[in-house]
């Protein structure tokens, strides 16, 4: 048992119920009046955009998503780390709206961030860093680290903020349920193809057995980008980046946010993305 505690980077193995430990909360995303969907005034006289733009915004195929990405890099000269920082901040912001620290049973709330070997994993590292700044207690599992300066720097930034990294993944869903209040799935993004290999096949098997909520970044890992996966993990929160992908039509969780407020208007028009009007200075928009 002492080895397990040391491995997971937490002082105590806290026993608890295998149900999401989230207090009741109010609707997290509010904005000003907009044409983007049916709205109503709440008791404070503010507009509540609870019903959002999921039937209007364009859902991208894998090919379209890749084309948009390439134009951002090549035509508009965005760098990978620049977009990764904006995406990761959006993810942390969406998590803070869906699961604010005050709604969680622990203080600070414990979050397990599982990062894959590509850019989606990089988004997860950035997300973990911002979650720490937002008052959460993230722990990272990053089993396949690319030998590239960008990812090495992201790891260093997290380590310098005293964010622990696990040496191995807990093998039992119950262990994760007991130690964490939320799991962030930052394993695979929209560019993933082929069969899921180890160690990620085993990781996804564990995630399917969780009772704590899962927040997936851009694509629920293991899903087909366009068709989804009814037998795969079922996140409670999906954070679509740039624009939703077609698989998001199969999402049945409670919260669907759009993040990544960096798309140039000309690019949005070219691909007819029909992105919603982000309220004020917000970097995320609730679609569902």
From Swiss-Prot:
Gene Ontology MF terms in the entry = identical protein binding; metal ion binding; NAD(P)HX epimerase activity; nucleotide binding
What cofactor(s) does the depicted protein rely on?
A: K(+)
Top EC class per UniProt?
A: isomerase
Reactions the enzyme catalyzes = (6R)-NADHX = (6S)-NADHX; (6R)-NADPHX = (6S)-NADPHX
Sites where Phosphoserine occurs are at 49
Q: Where does (6S)-NADPHX bind?
A: 119-123, 189-195, 218
Posttranslational modification: Undergoes physiological phosphorylation during sperm capacitation, downstream to PKA activation.
Q: How is the cofactor bound?
A: Binds 1 potassium ion per subunit.
Q: Which residues form the YjeF N-terminal domain?
A: 65-275
What's the domain of life for this entry? Eukaryota
| PROSITE patterns noted in UniProt | YJEF_N (PS51385)
Which is a GO BP term held by this UniProt record? metabolite repair
Residue interval of the organelle targeting sequence: 1-47
Q: Indicate where the modification N6-succinyllysine is found in the sequence.
A: 144
Where do the annotations place K(+) binding?
Answer: 120, 185, 221
Q: State which Enzyme Commission number(s) the record gives.
A: 5.1.99.6
Keywords associated with the record: Disease variant, Isomerase, Lipid transport, Metal-binding, Mitochondrion, NAD, NADP, Neurodegeneration, Nucleotide-binding, Phosphoprotein, Potassium, Secreted, Transit peptide, Transport
Q: Sum up the protein's function in the record's words.
A: Catalyzes the epimerization of the S- and R-forms of NAD(P)HX, a damaged form of NAD(P)H that is a result of enzymatic or heat-dependent hydration. This is a prerequisite for the S-specific NAD(P)H-hydrate dehydratase to allow the repair of both epimers of NAD(P)HX. Accelerates cholesterol efflux from endothelial cells to high-density lipoprotein (HDL) and thereby regulates angiogenesis.
Q: Which disease is it linked to?
A: Encephalopathy, progressive, early-onset, with brain edema and/or leukoencephalopathy 1: An autosomal recessive severe neurometabolic disorder characterized by severe leukoencephalopathy usually associated with a trivial febrile illness. Affected infants tend to show normal early development followed by acute psychomotor regression with ataxia, hypotonia, respiratory insufficiency, and seizures. Disease course is rapidly progressive, leading to coma, global brain atrophy, and death in the first years of life.
UniProt subunit comment = Homodimer. Interacts with APOA1 and APOA2.
Q: Which NCBIfam families match?
A: yjeF_nterm
Q: Please state which protein family the record places this protein in.
A: Belongs to the NnrE/AIBP family.
Name of the protein in question: NAD(P)H-hydrate epimerase
Species, as recorded: Homo sapiens (Human)
- Gene name, please? NAXE
């Amino acid at each position: 048992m002492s080895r397990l505690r040391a491995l997971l980077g937490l002082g105590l193995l806290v026993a608890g119920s295998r149900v999401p430990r989230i207090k009741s909360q109010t609707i997290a995303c509010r904005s000003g009046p907009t044409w983007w969907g049916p709205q109503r005034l709440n008791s404070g006289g503010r507009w509540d955009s609870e019903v959002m733009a999921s039937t209007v915004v364009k859902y991208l195929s894998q090919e379209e998503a890749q084309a948009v990405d390439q134009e951002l890099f090549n035509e508009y000269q965005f760098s990978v780390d620049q977009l990764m920082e904006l995406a990761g901040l959006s993810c942390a912001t969406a998590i803070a709206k869906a699961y604010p620290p005050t709604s969680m049973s622990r203080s600070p709330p414990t979050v397990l961030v599982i990062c894959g070997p590509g850019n989606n994993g990089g988004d997860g590292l950035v997300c973990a860093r911002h979650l720490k700044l937002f008052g959460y207690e993230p722990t990272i599992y990053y089993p396949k680290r690319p030998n590239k300066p960008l990812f090495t720097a992201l790891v260093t930034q997290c380590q310098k903020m005293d964010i622990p990294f696990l040496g191995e993944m807990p093998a039992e869903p119950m262990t994760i349920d007991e130690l964490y209040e939320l799991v962030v799935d930052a394993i695979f993004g929209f560019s993933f193809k082929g069969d899921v290999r180890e160690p990620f096949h085993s990781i996804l098997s564990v995630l399917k057995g969780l009772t704590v909520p899962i927040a997936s970044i851009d694509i629920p890992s293991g899903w087909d980008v366009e068709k989804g996966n009814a037998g795969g993990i079922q996140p409670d929160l999906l954070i679509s980046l740039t624009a939703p992908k077609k698989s998001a039509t199969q999402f049945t969780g409670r919260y669907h946010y759009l993040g990544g407020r960096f798309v140039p208007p000309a690019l949005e028009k070219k691909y007819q993305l029909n992105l919603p009007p982000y309220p004020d200075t917000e970097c995320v928009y609730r679609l569902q």
